Amino acid sequence: KKICEIADNLEPRAYTSREFIKEIGKYLKTNSKKKGSLIETAYDKNVPIFCPAFTDSSAGFGLVMHQEKNPKKCITIDSIREFRELTEIKIKSKSSGLLMIGGGVPKNFVQDTVVCAELLGKKVDMHKYAIQITVADTRDGACSSSTLKEASSWGKVDVSKEQMVFAEATSVLPLIASD
């Protein structure tokens, strides 16, 4: 219901998930009883969060409620503009690396910025490194049906600096992130 409330108070137009998540952070900054969430902290530090499969989440239900209430004046999530925005970040970056938790749409989305940049006529380097934390297995079509080694065959990731971490993210990410 809070997602619906946030959306109800925005100008009706297409937003990227990054723009909408920033609005969630703004809302949390003023209204959250529990401070220091990831989204609020990202908002405070002006760190963008991209979620290319935003509608494939419980937050997506809030947007469905919002659109049901406001069929003619509603917001939408524009994943194509978001992909272009992320590709522009890749084009402007001197180098890039990936830390992916899980797989699916977000994994493909960020890896494909290299391919998209090239299709737009821009010369970009592969992602310098890639780490994927996942419990998925390619044998059953999970893991987006490919390991990072396959991504190197498409020119997305430098194969010499890729690492698959087959583990549950909540157990290993704190170890990776700690100092």
State each model region's role.
Residues 15, 19, 33, 37, ...:
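Conserved active-site and cofactor/substrate-binding residues in soluble primary-metabolism enzymes
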Residues 40-43, 90-93, 122-125:
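Solvent-exposed alpha-helices and their adjacent loops that cap or buttress functional pockets
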Residues 52-97, 106:
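Active-site rim loops that border cofactor/substrate pockets in soluble metabolic enzymes
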Residues 60-63, 109-113, 142-144:
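A short acidic (Asp/Glu
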Residues 71-85, 116-135:
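Gly/Ser/Thr-rich active-site loops/lids in small-molecule metabolic enzymes
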Residues 95, 105, 119-179:
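C-terminal functional extensions of proteins
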